[in-house]
């Protein structure tokens, strides 16, 4: 089978975990890892594995644009705004793992099929990837007037990129809850928990559905079906208890355990982003290859 060439921009935690996940892909061929710190663990590992290593950032990649058709940006929201412009000019498809939200917001099981021709796809945030599918699952049965999510992650799993993007996290996640989840109003809260040993990523979804006849069984069934769908590409994603129904208020408790590729298993918040990124890139690649043979 033909493969589509991809490169990773950003050699931190997310970029390095992504590198390990891409090695298992049957349709994506990782060619290069791009960073700005030649001493970073990510670039060191990429060099050991035989990938092209660029330590001069995006400038270095643009000198060898033939290295990849799809570029994963695992840097920061502010950096992505600059990168997006340059990569668009170079004719690249971009998968944005920062909360910059320059391109189309995508949650794979909800709306990926609508955005297969986009040049820039944004994966929102870890909290968004974990909770928006649940908001959507409720909303497809009964309209959601308000949805609030609380994402609690281990302090140790929050690197400098995550910490620099807290404001963007809350804004972009809330936007995704509304635009993709379907809630009329959305709100997002992130909590960094310093507990030792580090906790798994936990997410709580609170949804207020509009007044009227509520089919509780249909809502619960829809949520459980969505959990199974997300598990197809994030095996450590699970619901901790049955959804709690209280009048028109629905509460769902979720947990995300990482695959333990590069990051510890408690870093489910980072793992769900890299797993979603690979899923999206594989579908974009299939679409590109199908268009070439059509």
From Swiss-Prot:
EC class of the enzyme, as a word: oxidoreductase
Similarity comment: Belongs to the acetaldehyde dehydrogenase family.
GO molecular function, one term: NAD binding
Alphabetical UniProt keywords: Aromatic hydrocarbons catabolism, NAD, Oxidoreductase, Plasmid
Catalytic activity, reaction form: acetaldehyde + NAD(+) + CoA = acetyl-CoA + NADH + H(+)
Active site location: 126
Protein name: Acetaldehyde dehydrogenase
InterPro entries xref list: Acetaldehyde_dehydrogenase, Acetylaldehyde_DH_C, NAD(P)-bd_dom_sf, Semialdehyde_DH_NAD-bd
Protein residues bound to NAD(+): 11-14, 157-165, 269
Entry EC no(s): 1.2.1.10
Gene Ontology biological process terms, A to Z: catabolic process
Domain of life: Bacteria
Pfam families in alphabetical order: AcetDehyd-dimer, Semialdhyde_dh
């Amino acid at each position: 089978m033909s493969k589509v060439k991809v490169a990773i921009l950003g050699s931190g935690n997310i970029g390095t975990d992504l590198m390990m996940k891409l090695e298992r892909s049957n349709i994506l061929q990782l060619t290069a890892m791009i960073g700005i710190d030649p001493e970073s663990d990510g670039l060191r590992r990429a060099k050991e594995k035989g990938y092209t290593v660029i330590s001069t950032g995006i400038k270095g990649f643009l000198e060898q644009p033939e290295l990849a058709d799809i570029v994963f940006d695992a840097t920061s929201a502010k950096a992505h705004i600059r990168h997006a412009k340059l990569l668009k000019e170079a004719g690249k498809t971009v998968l944005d793992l920062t909360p910059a939200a320059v391109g189309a917001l995508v949650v794979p099981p909800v709306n990926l099929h609508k955005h297969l021709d986009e040049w820039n796809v944004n994966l929102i945030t870890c909290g968004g990837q974990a909770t928006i599918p649940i908001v959507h699952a409720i909303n497809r049965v009964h309209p959601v007037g308000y949805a609030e999510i609380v994402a609690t992650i281990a302090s140790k799993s929050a690197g400098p990129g995550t910490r620099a993007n807290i404001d963007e996290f809350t804004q972009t996640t809330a936007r995704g809850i509304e635009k993709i989840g379907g809630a009329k109003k959305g709100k997002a809260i992130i909590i960094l928990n310093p507990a030792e040993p580090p906790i798994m990523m936990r997410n709580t979804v609170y949804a207020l559905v509009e007044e009227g006849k509520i089919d509780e069984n249909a809502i619960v069934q829809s949520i459980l079906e969505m959990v199974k769908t997300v598990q197809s590409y994030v095996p450590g994603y699970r619901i901790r208890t049955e959804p709690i129904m209280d009048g028109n208020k629905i509460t769902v408790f979720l947990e995300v355990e990482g695959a333990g590729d590069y990051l510890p298993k408690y870093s489910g918040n980072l793992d769900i982003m890299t797993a979603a990124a690979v899923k999206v890139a594989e579908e974009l690649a299939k679409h590109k290859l199908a268009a070439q043979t059509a």
